């Protein structure tokens, strides 16, 4: 049975969700309606031509009230308040909330009141019914969950990596650094921002800033609550990021033991969510990679028998957008 979806917000993630659905030729998800503050002409141009992911290989057109993809007319609106989007009228069952502006259940319940059955949020969300990292804790979902957070791109990389380590070696504590591509929240040139570091030119500096990914792990994997901390270093690249997790374990570890554990799960239970590579690659080589985490086995290291470091690449746009679609399909299957 097809899932009829709507998308609120055509920023970086909203556009990538659309591309993920179309490029994968996913017959289980049908886009019925898009709401975006800019008009259909501007939205059509931005999804067709992308500076990071290249030209969208689809037949794209528009009129005043539609975005037309491969001759499929998708109704289009420009409501600034979610209370004004009538999802019921457009035949939408699931909403991908991709604005990044509505980050609490109290705000998002308006989607449900307007006809949506489920809302999948592209960001951390206060009081969400569930926060899900696909490949780690989707089995916690039930048919009554309505507001579902897909966490963040960094959490989607860190969680499966930490989970594999914890199951195999029992993490006692750890510290994560994400070397993260700059995002649209930063300034191209120095300008005002509530974070004085993000106020500085994204293309000229390494910008230390906060990340909630390490603390969010405790919500995803309760046995790791309070055991991880982290920081983000924004760097002057437009896409693809890298986590480095330094950790201490109860069980003895070695480079081979760690890499073998990831090789095993990449072929089985985490296939398509987690990959492992031994090639000596750089960030651009992982652009448009749909996995949540690509462990770089050449960077795995240990000190003694109980302290280690693991590195994992992730396309912070494309991988995350694909996991949002996976969550929608999983929820639909159990509902």
Q: Where are these predicted regions, by residue range?
A:
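N-terminal Rossmann-like NAD(P) cofactor-binding subdomain of oxidoreductases
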Residues: 1-199, 302, 326, 334
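C-terminal active-site/capping subdomain that shapes the small-molecule cofactor and substrate pocket
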Residues: 3, 230, 242, 246-335
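Generic structural signal for well-ordered, non-membrane alpha-helical segments
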Residues: 10, 14, 104, 151-154, ...
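Predominant activation on well-ordered alpha-helical scaffold segments within soluble catalytic domains
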Residues: 14, 18, 109, 159-166, ...
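Glycine-rich beta-alpha junction loops
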Residues: 37-39, 125, 152-154, 178-185, ...
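A generic structural signal for well-ordered coil/turn residues at beta-strand boundaries
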Residues: 63, 128, 202, 239-241, ...
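A broad structural signal for alpha-helix termini and local helix breaks/kinks
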Residues: 99, 169, 221-222, 249, ...
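Catalytic core of tubulin tyrosine ligase-like
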Residues: 170-232, 238
């Amino acid at each position: 049975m097809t899932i009829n979806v709507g998308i609120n917000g055509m920023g970086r993630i909203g556009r990538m969700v659309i591309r993920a659905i179309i490029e994968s030729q996913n017959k289980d998800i049908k886009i019925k309606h898009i709401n975006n503050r800019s008009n259909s002409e501007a939205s059509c141009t931005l999804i067709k031509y992308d500076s990071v992911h290249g030209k969208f290989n689809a037949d794209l057109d528009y009129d005043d009230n539609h975005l037309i993809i491969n001759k499929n007319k998708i109704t289009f609106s420009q409501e600034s308040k979610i209370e004004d989007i009538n999802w019921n009228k457009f035949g939408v069952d699931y909403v991908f909330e991709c604005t990044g502006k509505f980050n609490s259940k109290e705000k998002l319940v308006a989607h449900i009141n307007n006809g949506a059955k489920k809302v999948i949020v592209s960001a951390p969300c206060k009081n969400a019914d569930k926060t899900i990292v696909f490949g780690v804790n989707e089995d916690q979902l039930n048919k009554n969950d309505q507001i579902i957070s897909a966490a963040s791109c960094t959490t989607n990389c860190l969680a499966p990596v930490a989970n594999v380590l914890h199951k195999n070696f029992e993490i006692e504590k750890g510290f994560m650094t994400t070397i993260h591509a700059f995002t649209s929240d930063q300034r191209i040139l120095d300008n005002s921002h509530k974070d004085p570091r993000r106020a500085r030119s994204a293309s000229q500096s390494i910008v230390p800033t906060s990340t909630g990914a390490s603390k969010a792990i405790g919500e995803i994997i309760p046995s790791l609550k309070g055991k991880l901390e982290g920081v983000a270093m924004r760097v002057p690249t437009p896409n693809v990021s890298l986590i480095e997790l330094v950790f201490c374990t109860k069980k003895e570890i070695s480079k081979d033991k760690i890499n073998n554990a990831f090789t095993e799960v990449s072929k089985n239970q985490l296939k398509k969510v987690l990959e492992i590579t031994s090639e000596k690659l750089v960030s651009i080589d992982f652009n448009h990679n749909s996995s949540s985490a690509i462990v770089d086995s050449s960077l795995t290291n240990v000190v003694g028998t109980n302290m280690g470091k693991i590195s994992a690449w992730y396309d912070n746009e494309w991988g995350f957008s694909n996991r949002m679609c996976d969550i929608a399909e999983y929820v639909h299957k159990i509902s």
